[in-house]
Amino acid sequence: MIVVTTDFVPGYEIVETLGIVTGSIVNSKHLGKDIAAAFKTLAGGEIKSYTELLVESRNIALKRMIDEAEKLGADAVIGLRFGSSSVMQSAAEILAYGTAVKLRKLSE
C-alpha cells in the first residue's frame, strides 16, 4: 500500500477515487504514569512515556486506516493527515485520514 501526504503519487495516474478512509484510537496512560508525568511538567523536559504512547497510537491509527483502504481495494491513500483531540482529561484520540484511490502506473 502506497501512503503519501500529497494529492498525487509520482509515476502513477489516479484512475478511481474510492473515498475517505480513517483509522483512529483513543488511548490513555496508566494512572501511576500520569502522576509521574505531572511531576515532570514541573521540572520541564520531554515526557517520554507520553511520547511513546503517541507514537504507538499514531502507528495503530495509520494501520487501521490502511486496513480500511485495503478492504476497498485501494492501491494507495493520498493526502494523509493526522489529527488529535482530547477525549477526557487523560485520554486522547489520534486520527489518521486520507483518500483511498486506485492507480495506474505511467509508462516510462
Curated annotation (Swiss-Prot):
Pfam families, alphabetized: YbjQ_1 (PF01906)
Similarity comment text for this entry: Belongs to the UPF0145 family.
PANTHER family, per the entry: UPF0145 PROTEIN SCO3412, UPF0145 PROTEIN YBJQ
HAMAP family: UPF0145
Protein's name according to its UniProt entry: UPF0145 protein Fnod_0426
